[in-house]
Amino acid sequence: CIRDSLYTSGRIFTKQYFRYGKFEIKAKLPVTAGVWPALWFKANSGPACVGEIDLVEYIGCMKAEKMNVNVHLWGTFGGKKNNHKQYPRSVAVNISNYHIYTLEMLRGKLVFKVDGKVVYEVKKGDIEYWPFDETSYRLMIALSYGGTWAGSCGLADNSLPQSIKVDYVKYYRLKEECND
């Protein structure tokens, strides 16, 4: 659906869902007010609590040399319905340059890397609930403009259009998963 609008946002995603493995994405992302580029993983469905994995997330209020990685829990957990918790980490990297962003999805552990260096690691016991072994995830590459979060930084209409430049996306299946 295309609406009569001054701006559009977009996303592409994998058709297939993945449970375990290693993703590498070589990309450079825009850094201007009002943009919200993200490389993230959305849950297929599954338990009452589902997870979200943000490999890269940025909004224009952040400095160009900072980005966030994050793990979210959504749904019913901790005795509450419609609950949401997040476990973010700020990472020093200039996303306006090409970098290789890596997510290793392992049993009981998520490892985030930039250019081969571990920048964040979350293990099953580190957070309140662990849905990441219970369902599959698809990769989403998204670029939004405005909205409640990114728009709170102001908008830079004169810097449009913007885009995410992707050199490649690679997926490596774990050897132990090949026998399933």
Language model regions located:
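GH16 jelly-roll
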Residues: 3-180
